[in-house]
Amino acid sequence: MNKKINWRRQLTQLEKQTLTELKNKEMIKQGTFYKLEQTFPEESAYTYYGLYRKEQTIQAYIVGYCFDGETLEATIVAPNVGPFFEELVQELEKQAALWGMKEVFLVMDDKQSVGLNYFNRQGIVPAFSEQYLVFQRETYSQALAKLTLLRPRVADLDSLARLLEGTPLPEDLQRTLIYKENNQLLATLRLDHFENEWGIYGFVVTKTQRGRGLGRQVLQSALRMILENSASATIFLEVETENQAALHLYQTEGFQVRNQYNYY
């Protein structure tokens, strides 16, 4: 039987539909989640697709995201079969080396048994992990703060880069909001949305304001903006498991952990 992995930067509409159906089927069968963008970026400078075909039928796939030209974050969507998974991991490692990647992370739900068994056998532990949290608006009863969150201007970009410890991507900058007092940039976050699903990313408060309640007010103000746009919105965010202060903030503001992603 002919097996082949074909690497692509763009997908046809039929391929997009096939990949979405395969992902949804495996999520139901395995009871796990995949860390993937909601859309398939067209001509994306940072997305790679590896399509695993058997007799011309796509049976599994790999999606890799590279935002800095050096680090690849990849997700494998495949049946829960050991040899199948190992073959895809080997293909990913080989291809990443050809692209000149300095670092590769395989991102997996911590309940994905085949992947866990694969890394456990090799004595490999996650480099780090993230909790994926979802806002429970039905049970949230607190009054939301209403700080003014603004789009950054050219004059804000240097301060924003210092706060983020790096220059944001142009496409991220379009969705970035900042909070300022006395012309000082004190906090930032980014709101991404697809249809009625909203993600809060890149949430950073300047060190001098941490632990003083500003982060809570900025988060509440972002929630207010989203819910005023769509009262039925699904809102999510992610936080590293070691960041207990942020995790506590999110959980006291109506977010509950849905699952955990491990980065190997």
Show which residues each predicted segment covers.
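Active-site rim helix/loop that mediates acceptor-substrate recognition in acyltransferases
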Residues: 26-54, 161-190
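Conserved active-site tyrosine of GNAT-family acetyltransferases
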Residues: 115-120, 124, 250, 255
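Conserved catalytic-core motifs of GNAT/GCN5-like acyltransferases
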Residues: 125-138, 238, 256-264
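Conserved acetyl-CoA-binding loop-helix of GNAT-fold acetyltransferases
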Residues: 82-94, 205, 211-224, 247-252
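Short amphipathic alpha-helix that is part of the acyltransferase structural core
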Residues: 1-35, 130, 140-168
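Conserved beta-strand-loop-alpha-helix junction that forms the acyl-donor binding cleft
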Residues: 106-114, 236-247, 263-264
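Conserved GNAT acetyl-CoA-binding A-motif
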Residues: 97-109, 226-238
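Conserved donor-binding loop and adjoining core beta-sheet/short helix segment
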Residues: 34-87, 189-198
